Regions:
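Functionally important transmembrane alpha-helices
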Residues: 216-218
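Extracellular beta-strand-rich solenoid/capping regions of secreted or surface-exposed proteins
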Residues: 58-66, 72-90, 96-115, 119-133, ...
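Short N-terminal segments immediately surrounding and downstream of signal-peptide cleavage
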Residues: 20-31
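Short, solvent-exposed beta-strand edge segments and adjacent coil->beta transition regions
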Residues: 46-48, 124, 156, 212
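Fungal secretory targeting signals
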Residues: 1-19
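Acidic Gly/Asp/Thr-rich repetitive segments characteristic of extracellular carbohydrate-active
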Residues: 29-69
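Right-handed parallel beta-helix
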Residues: 86, 91-92, 109-120, 133-147, ...
Length: 218
C-alpha cells in the first residue's frame, strides 16, 4: 500500500452499531482545497429526486447534472453503479442498503455519499474512488458479512481511493467485520500518476474486527 499526503484527524470510537457523532459539517481536504468545497448536488439549479428501485437509482446517478438523490430501501445491484459528477447520494433512514455490487466513482468530481449500509460486496470494493476529485464519504456502514468464514479473498476493500484521486474526506463511517478495510493508493507502478495527488482526510471513523491490519489505521 502506498500512501500519499494523508491526513488522519481523529479516530473516535463509537459505542453503537454506526457512528454516533452529531457532526455533519464537511472538514478536511474535501472542503479545504484549491478547487472549492465538495457540495455534491447542492448547487444552483439542481434537482431533488427520491428513488426506491434499482432502475430509478441508476437513472438518477447518471450524467453530470447537479442532483440530490434520496434513496429508500435496499438496492441489490448485479453490476457496479457508476456515480456521475455533481451528485449527493443520501440514504433515507436506517434501512438504506447497497448489496450485490458496490459503488464506483470514476473520473468524477463533486460527489457525496452519505448514510448507506454497504454489505457483502464480493470480489470488489464497497466504494471505489478512482481518478476523481472532491468526494465526501460520510456516515456510512461497511461490512462484508460471513466474516471471517468467507476468508480474506472473497471481498476486496471497503472504501478504496486510488489513481490520482484528490481532495477526499472520509468521515463518521463504521468499518467492521471485514478482512480488508480502506487503502489510499494501490500499487507502486502508479507512482507517477499518484504523485501530487491523494490528499485524503479521515476523521471520526470507527474500525472494529477488521482482519488485515495493513489496510486499517495504525
Amino acid at each position: 500500500m502506498k500512501l500519499s499526503i494523508l491526513s488522519f484527524f481523529t479516530f473516535a470510537l463509537a459505542a453503537s452499531a454506526a457512528p454516533a457523532g452529531t457532526g455533519f459539517d464537511l472538514v478536511g481536504f474535501g472542503k479545504d482545497n484549491p478547487v472549492g468545497p465538495t457540495t455534491g448536488g447542492d448547487q444552483k439549479g439542481s434537482k431533488t429526486v427520491t428513488v426506491s428501485t434499482v432502475p430509478e437509482f441508476l437513472a438518477a446517478i447518471n450524467g453530470t447534472s447537479p442532483t440530490i438523490i434520496y434513496a429508500k430501501g435496499t438496492f441489490n445491484f448485479t453490476s457496479r453503479p457508476r456515480i456521475g459528477s455533481n451528485k449527493s447520494l443520501i440514504g433515507m433512514g436506517s434501512g438504506a442498503w447497497i448489496t450485490g455490487k458496490g459503488l464506483t466513482i470514476l473520473n468524477a468530481t463533486n460527489v457525496i455519499v452519505r448514510n448507506f449500509g454497504i454489505r457483502g460486496i464480493v470480489d470488489n470494493d464497497g466504494i471505489t474512488i478512482q481518478n476523481s476529485q472532491r468526494v465526501w464519504i460520510d456516515h456510512n456502514e461497511f461490512t462484508s458479512g460471513n466474516f471471517p468464514a468467507a476468508g480474506p479473498d472473497a471481498f476486496d476493500g471497503q472504501c478504496d481511493i486510488v489513481r490520482a484521486s484528490d481532495w477526499i474526506t472520509v468521515s463518521w463511517n463504521y468499518f467492521h467485520d471485514h478482512w480488508k478495510s480502506s487503502l489510499v493508493g494501490n500499487d507502486d507502478k502508479f507512482r507517477d500518476i499518484d504523485f501530487g495527488h491523494l490528499h485524503v482526510t479521515y476523521h471520526h471513523n470507527y474500525w472494529k474486527n477488521e482482519g488485515r491490519s495493513f489496510r486499517s489505521p495504525k
